[in-house]
Amino acid sequence: WSTPSRGLENIFITRSDTLFPRRNRSTITPTRIFTRRLHLADVRFACISGDFLLYLEARFGRFDKLRPEGGSATGSEFCNQDGKRTNGVIPIIDMAEKALKYPIGIQTFKDIVEGGYVYVDKTGFVAELADKYRYVFLSRPRRFGKSLLSSTLHSYFSGEEELFRGLKASEMNSDWMRHPVFHFDMSTAKHMTELQLIRNIGYKLDFYEEEYGNDTRIARDDVNARLERLIMEAVRKTGEKAVIIIDEYDAPLLDVMNDREKLLPMRQIMRNFYSPIKSLDPYLRFVFITGINKFAQLSIFSELNNLKNISMMPEYSAICGISQPELENRLKEPVQEMAERLLVSCDEVLRQLKRNYDGYHFCANSEDIYNPYSLINALSDKEIKNFWFDTGTPTYLSLIHISE
């Protein structure tokens, strides 16, 4: 802590080293603080004296923890939120709860909602899909929010109504039925041999067999029969139709796309696993499949001819990613914080974000869609850089380049 002076013009702060290095943590006059446009979300604790607090309240409106007692503005008469005197000229303000939390790397809807993270409401799309369709396929690039959307559907069909309070889906759905949900994340099955892939699928089925039981007469590697029995047993036990969510269905095949000898047997394993879906129609409430490739390109769902591909439908162009109106209206506060950190206007921040991250169009005359991973990282770090490419080499593009 800095030692306060008797003057009324000083603010004393401790914060991260990014804006003020440790050697410069000292008395900061109003001129310095506003020249550098320090945002109060960057402040962990503040020691403020006298009239300067009133000026800050008028300037920022963020000091809701302190109130002057009896209309006096002298530091010795400040009291904290519970009405107790601070007995001195150093009232302490905890600003940690003011900082926005960004869901970097978090792909679970429940964790984002319960953790109070920044969230752009996509639940209206979820409720609409659940109402209009039974079998849905969505193709989007990597790091584009497919897994979060899948998780949101999982919570929706699990009847977790409390997670959707205040969100669009709560206005559209009055019947929160709890369905048995089978959620398969195939991103965990990358870079595997045929035997490893079968075992990986088997482990995923083990999880649901712990809840709904297994049939010892079915061979462990007969994943087709195990999936079929699981769905039928879940419907029998719960009395409600089942939901199947397959996230990144094509992940096991991406690294063998240019090797036909390896691709064919791996594709056959996946085709065999997914094949019961069509015959299970009487037992299914909803099926949702995501991937990078169109399902027709890999011929895995050739038997599932009732799959609705919404990937290039205009009304779902913003189902993943962030649209321009969402950025300007729902992410207004993060944009403002970034502008203050970079010492530029909000319009300039929007211009830079647009130039770097909104190059996606998923149908004719599509609105501009921002890559959510890059955009959220930029708002969190308050800087412009190539976040998407830094996460790893885009394998499929690399393979295409090699094959050419």
Label the predicted regions.
Residues 1-6, 10-16, 22-26, 32, ...:
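Low-acidity, Ser/Thr- and Arg-rich intrinsically disordered low-complexity segments
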